[in-house]
Amino acid sequence: MAKKIEKSAKKKFREKVLLGVAHIQSTFNNTIVTITTNKGNVLAWSSAGACGFKGARKKTPLAAKQAAENAAQTCVSQGMREIRVNVKGAGAGREAALRGLRDAGLNITIIRDITPIPHNGCRPPKKRRI
């Protein structure tokens, strides 16, 4: 007769992080929100596409706010209170994502704009002809 093997699963230890860093990448087609610790370890992430928005609706401010709220709610449930924000990109969801973080219950301390600005580097995309 076979013996039963008892497995004892270790509980994953999650340390309480009170201060986090939110990285908001707002492109012309999507908005991605990643919340990390001060060291850079990812705690939660969300994007407009991951929230169920498809196609042209991903670039809307409503989708960006929803993505920020989803990422922030998981961190608030783990005990996070304050957050520093790094914003990158020139999309429509920049300010809406900040509102989503605030509405989820996080206290925003610093907002930094880290959009990369070329010193005449790569050639930009051609102008649209409609």
Swiss-Prot record:
Q: Which InterPro entries match?
A: Ribosomal_uS11, Ribosomal_uS11_bac-type, Ribosomal_uS11_CS, Ribosomal_uS11_sf
Q: Which UniProt keywords apply?
A: Chloroplast, Plastid, Ribonucleoprotein, Ribosomal protein, RNA-binding, rRNA-binding
Q: Which domain of life is it from?
A: Eukaryota
- Assembly description: Part of the 30S ribosomal subunit.
- Describe the family membership recorded for this protein in Swiss-Prot or TrEMBL: Belongs to the universal ribosomal protein uS11 family.
Output this protein's name: Small ribosomal subunit protein uS11c
Phylogenetic lineage: Eukaryota, Viridiplantae, Chlorophyta, core chlorophytes, Trebouxiophyceae
What HAMAP family does the record tag this protein with? Ribosomal_uS11
Checking Pfam families in the record gives: Ribosomal_S11 (PF00411)
Q: Which Gene3D superfamilies match?
A: Ribosomal protein S11
A Gene Ontology molecular function term of the record: rRNA binding
**Quick one: where is this thing mainly located?**
plastid
